[in-house]
């Protein structure tokens, strides 16, 4: 059974979608998730990333130069890269492992950091 996402996590996921569209992408990847996690204030992930000196401006600038606009998607499930899907699925595991009743932004961040081959980790 899936745990619900917290209100903050829902906002982060929506922000990741918005960031992808703003950058001209038809998909959401780990890179969009890290930008969203570092952009949505008053969340646990935001605090952790800021306390550890993540420079969101540098990440966004790097994304603008490394990502190409477009990409074909055929449906809602295909909207997320395999890496982003794994991160969101693994965030469920992290929440359960930590005995949480819902998936918080900290669980998404934990899952993202463990996805060592993803674009977001390389940008960090």
Regions found by a protein language model. Give the residues of each.
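Histone-fold recognition with a strong bias for associated Lys/Arg-rich disordered tails
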Residues: 1-124
């Amino acid at each position: 059974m899936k745990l619900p996402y917290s209100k903050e996590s829902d906002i982060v996921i929506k922000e990741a979608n918005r960031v992808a569209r703003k950058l001209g992408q038809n998909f959401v990847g780990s890179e969009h998730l890290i930008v969203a996690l570092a952009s949505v204030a008053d969340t646990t992930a935001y605090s952790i990333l800021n306390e550890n000196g993540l420079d969101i401006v540098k990440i966004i600038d790097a994304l603008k130069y490394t990502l190409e606009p477009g990409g074909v998607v055929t449906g809602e499930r295909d909207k997320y890269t395999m890496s982003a899907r794994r991160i969101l699925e693994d965030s469920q595991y992290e929440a359960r492992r930590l005995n949480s009743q819902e998936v918080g932004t900290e669980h998404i961040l934990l899952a993202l950091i463990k996805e060592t081959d993803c674009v977001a980790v390389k940008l960090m």
